[in-house]
Amino acid sequence: MVPFSNGSGCMKLPDLNEARKRSSKDILIKTNEYIVKENLKELGLGKKYYIKTYGCQMNVHDSENIKAILEDMSFTETDVFEDADLILLNTCAIRENAHNKVFGFLGRVEHLKQTRPHIICGVCGCMAQEENVVNEIRDKYRWVDIVFGTHNIHNIPNILAKSMERKEQEIEVFSIEGDVLENLPVKRDSKYKAWVNIMYGCDKFCTYCIVPYTRGKQRSREPKFIIDEVKKLVEDGYKEITLLGQNVNAYGKDLKINYKMGDLLRDVAKTGIDRIRFMTSHPWDFDDDMISAIKENENIMPYVHLPLQSGSDKILKLMGRRYTKEKYLELYKKLKENIPNVSITTDIIVGFPGETEEDFNDTLEVVNECKYDSAFTFIFSPRVGTPAAKMNDNVTEEEKNERLYKLNDLVNKYANLANQRYLNKVTKVLIEGIGEKGNLFGYTDTMKLVNVDGSEDNIGKIVDVEITDIKTWSLDGKIV
């Protein structure tokens, strides 16, 4: 971190060079690090907070922690942005589009502050870990009151208190990751599905990815804390948990015990939770023991998100992905052969620097072979500070858009085809709530969205649903 004096205090700014470092220092497991001082427990009394979350499931779960911390300080949540006394943007740094959305929303906050100047505005999450972003906020968005990073969530009470006392911008961003904190509170968004962090950070350093810089080095939680958390969720009536990490397949490799992701999956399955999911997976670390664990346990869902990124060996090497097209397809076939009815989805980037038409056709070839149930597709977005951002971006915007269109056309074809196999079949669906059109909605074990006709009494239950119609990205059905 870099100290910066603003005249009356010291700001802790992010430093990309520091964020690249990976120390050999042991990560400590701390069970009493988070605390709200007595004099801060009523700091938010009579005040409302609003959180807007961008990005991945890890960010969603971070926001659940932030909400609980704020409520420990007597703030109450509001869904109405204009009514809030505290507005926090929990940001994503993975693509430029996410940046633009955040700065666009900040414009709305600035306008609101003109009529309600007492409002506190904060930026947190992965964008707060980016040196260039924080410098821009410091120089051009002086009305943003607080900025804190992914490693500073536990210190929100003190950051807020300083800002409210000093009436000036407070920035606290640690570039080097902290220890694993086991006593952060959580206010879960759902009563039926829960996110459970099993690890933090990533050491893969794919050349296009900013996450290893914004989330720090890999740190696994100890198994006992994860299992105890899931047991408590079972006691509280939860039906489904998702084990979260930037690369869950690498879980345990930093622990000084012989305990890996396959072991964790088996132990979590023993808790009796109805449904277990995990994300995100890196093909490099997806071993046979993980596949066996999924196959052996009915409550581990037959759904795997397996990012491809590119089907070209040349581009995969430039991306630093550590596998070849052949190795990826070998893993894909193992999953299909060993896990009945498995649904596999993926991520694909088009227009990476150096991608030729031949490279792109290699990607289409893999999509044609794998026939994914779904795919998240993106045009390459250079992130400041990553090796790929310095590569010669020799693919024209026209070529990028043409390739994305062609890829999406193929992805849509296979998504629709994958859904066809559900028509007139009965499948189990966890009903999660009421959709925009007034019908119930939920997900199959294979992560298919289903719009369901039925009574609200079924919310929170796993029910049998007959699929009556299929669309490209969803299914329609009725409870039987």
What are these regions (language model features)?
Residues 2-251, 289, 326-333, 337, ...:
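Proteins enriched for Cys/Gly/acidic motifs involved in redox and nucleic-acid/cofactor modification
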Residues 11-19, 35, 390-480:
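Terminal RNA-binding accessory module
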Residues 118-123, 130-132, 235-357, 368:
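Conserved SAM/AdoMet-binding glycine-rich loop
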Residues 138-153, 262-273, 296-301, 362-374:
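Structural recognition of alpha->loop->beta junctions
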Residues 189-192, 202-204, 300, 310, ...:
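Short flexible coil/turn linkers enriched for glycine and charged/polar residues
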Residues 206, 226, 243, 278, ...:
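Conserved, mostly hydrophobic/aromatic
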Residues 299-302, 314-430, 440, 461:
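A structural motif corresponding to the C-terminal lobe/cap of the Radical SAM core domain
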